[in-house]
C-alpha cells in the first residue's frame, strides 16, 4: 500500500466545529436584532414614519429564514460525514460571517439617523448575496 495516504476526517471534530459555528451565527443574529431594537428605543418617536416600520418588519422577518436556512445548510452539508464536504468549510464559514456581519450592520442602521435608501441598498446586497451563494 505504497501510495498517497487516505485523508480521514474526525467526525467529532467536524460536529463540534459546526456546533460552534451555529452558536457564533446565533450570536450574530441576536446582536443584529438587539441593534435594531436598541435603535428603535433610542430614536425620537416623532421621526418614525410608515416606511420605517415596514423596513423594520422586513428586517425582523428576514432574520428567521436566514438563520434557519444557514443552520440547516451546515447540518445537511457537513454532518452527513462525507469527506469531500469538509474541504469547503472555511469558505462557507467566511461567507456566513459576511452575511452575519451584514445583518448586524443593517440592524445598527435603525435609530435616529435612519436612512431608508441606505437600508434598502444593504438589504438588496444581502438578498443578492443569498442568491449567488
Residue ranges and their predicted role:
Residues 1-69:
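N-terminal topogenic module of multi-pass integral membrane proteins
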Residues 14-18, 83-84, 113-117:
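Juxtamembrane/transmembrane-helix boundary motifs in multi-pass membrane proteins
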Residues 79-95:
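Juxtamembrane helix-capping/reentrant segments at transmembrane boundaries
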Amino acid at each position: 500500500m505504497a501510495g498517497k495516504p487516505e485523508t480521514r476526517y474526525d467526525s467529532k471534530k467536524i460536529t463540534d466545529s459546526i456546533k460552534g459555528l451555529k452558536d457564533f451565527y446565533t450570536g450574530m443574529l441576536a446582536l443584529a436584532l438587539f441593534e435594531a431594537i436598541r435603535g428603535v428605543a433610542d430614536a425620537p418617536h416623532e421621526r418614525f414614519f410608515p416606511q420605517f416600520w415596514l423596513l423594520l418588519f422586513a428586517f425582523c422577518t428576514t432574520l428567521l429564514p436566514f438563520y434557519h436556512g444557514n443552520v440547516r445548510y451546515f447540518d445537511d452539508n457537513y454532518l452527513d460525514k462525507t469527506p469531500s464536504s469538509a474541504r469547503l468549510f472555511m469558505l462557507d464559514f467566511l461567507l456566513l460571517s459576511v452575511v452575519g456581519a451584514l445583518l448586524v450592520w443593517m440592524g445598527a442602521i435603525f435609530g435616529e439617523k435612519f436612512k431608508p435608501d441606505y437600508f434598502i441598498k444593504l438589504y438588496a446586497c444581502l438578498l443578492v448575496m443569498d442568491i449567488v451563494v
